[in-house]
Amino acid sequence: MKLEIKCFIICKVLPLVWLNMAQIQQVGAPEEKEKTTALKDLLSRIDLDELMKKDEPPLEFPDTLEGFNYAFNELGQLRHIQTGDPFVFNYREDLHRWNQKRYEALGEIITKHVYELLEKDCELEKVYLPVDATDSEPRSFIFMSKDAMTNPDKMLVLIHGSGVVRAGQWARRLIINEDLNSGSQIPYIKRAMKEGYAVIVLNPNENYIEVEKSKVPADQPSPDSSDEPAEKRERRERNPKETKKRRDFYEKYRNPQKEKETLQVYIRDNGSPEEHALYVWDNFISKAAAENILFVAHSYGGLTFVELMIQREADVKNKVAAVALTDSVHNVWHQDASKTLREWMRENCCNWVSSSEPLDTSVESTLPDCPRVSAGTERHELTSWKSFHSIFKFFDDALQAKNTKTKPTPTRRSNRIKHEDL
């Protein structure tokens, strides 16, 4: 309740007070000037700086896990260093914006931590895009195993969904609240490399960099100053300090921690997930030596893969052996997928969807594309993890079927490996 009262005073009452003061000053009568003096005295008694400190602390957060007093334990769980407790979102009560900014700051650290694990733990190499980028232009990057271009047998390509996730992640929320295994792509990478796959990890959400807008010099006139009435301009120029003080006061308490205004500078040929996937296909995957390419694509990553197929249908059909989708949001009608493409998907793709049904149970679909089976969970973000074993079994069946010239079939409950065995 106290917080609501403070916000009401700052956002509603004070602007009205300043407006009334301005109107009173324009009238100019002695008694009105006395009212102005009284109002100023009233405002001077309100310790607004202290009020705002209580409302919201500075949006300044540590840039390391240690700074947050968190670390990953031997089970890959994020825990408080002193207490061993899981991450707490509502660190400060009644300060949702501050808590959200704190969570986002931690999320950025998690992203960097996963990048480090991809390079150090999985021994992947970071490759910058575009391949011919100059030193002055923005760049993205992907991760590749050392044999990505030379492995003659098979390659696994991973595509995550949309949002804040980056290369190596399925769901940031899972990494923070549950563990690295369920939320990251690391289990897929390690198992694939152990089984002789080359690996490429796409980074489809790294589409631009943000640069701060250049600030207008303080002495530069505003664009519409020439249209300002002469009387108003003279009054403003007579008392510039008071005008600036009033403007700064209002701006500060209307938006006490105004975030920096930024411009988005898009990365050449990688300005969207679809562009990114097409670029990586043209410059890496299609040129790789692997005879069999296999994809795992989660959520929007499934839509991204279907768009890649639409753009490079013949090439994809020639090189891709199987595609595992996890709760994909693709739509073959909206994306104008051809009949031949839909037929290929029915034979070579399987979509593990969120469902209350047991793992690998067939789920009805209204779209004429690929088989749908249950991922064994109703949580969208968990579908890639819960279907982990089933997907590799599906890949094994697909590769064996290709070698024996028979059609691959999705895993069924009767022959699945239990997830709990992982």
UniProtKB/Swiss-Prot annotation:
Annotated compartments: Nucleus; Cytoplasm
Entries under Gene3D superfamilies matching the protein: alpha/beta hydrolase
Signal peptide: 1-19
A Pfam short name: Arb2
One GO biological process term: mRNA processing
GO CC annotations, alphabetized: cytoplasm; nucleus
UniProt superkingdom: Eukaryota
Keywords associated with the record: Cytoplasm, mRNA processing, mRNA splicing, Nucleus, Signal
UniProt biased composition (Basic and acidic residues): 229-242
SUPFAM superfamilies, per database record: alpha/beta-Hydrolases (SSF53474)
Region Disordered, residue ranges: 213-253, 403-422
Active site: S299 (nucleophile)
Family membership noted in the UniProt record: Belongs to the ARB2A family.
Function recorded in the entry: May play role in the regulation of alternative splicing. May have hydrolase activity.
Protein name as it appears in the record: Cotranscriptional regulator ARB2A homolog
Natural source organism: Xenopus tropicalis
The gene coding this protein: arb2a
